[in-house]
Amino acid sequence: MHKLLVPVDGSDNAMRALEYAIRLAKACGPTEPVILYVHEPPIVYGELAIYLPEEKLKELQRKHGEDILRPYIETAKRAGVTFTSQVLIGDIPKSIVSCAETLGCSGIVMGTRGMSAIGNLVAGSVATKVIHLTKFPVTLVK
């Protein structure tokens, strides 16, 4: 079965990317979308690092990721496709590429711009970095 990695971030473009991946999965036979949310760890300075243990911080990040994934999971369920989902914590572009490599994905389908896109004309900074870091085909959905 082919796997298509679909990184999401809560944006409309990410939802359109998932919808496109679902259409591909239905049209091309056994293809499984893998819905991925990557939570970039915050930079914590001073006393906050003392009061918020690392495990508690990771738990909060995973919970936030699950909340972000919920509408995407519901969309995939309604479409009736086989899919998986996961939350990773780390550098967003590097985590996307690493996940695609680990899972042996056939490609990456992602939105052109996400929630934090500012100023890039064609593609957001995450999409641009993923394109430069990966060996996999990347489809950008606007």
Where would I find each of the regions flagged by the language model?
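Conserved beta-strand positions in the Rossmann-like core of class I SAM-dependent methyltransferases
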Residues: 34, 84, 139
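Small/aliphatic-rich secondary-structure junction motif
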Residues: 2-52
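Glycine-rich, Arg-bearing micro-motifs that act as flexible, cationic patches
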Residues: 110-132
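A short acidic, glycine-rich active-site loop
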Residues: 53-67
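Short, flexible loop segments at boundaries between secondary-structure elements
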Residues: 133-142
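Structural beta-alpha unit
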Residues: 74-108
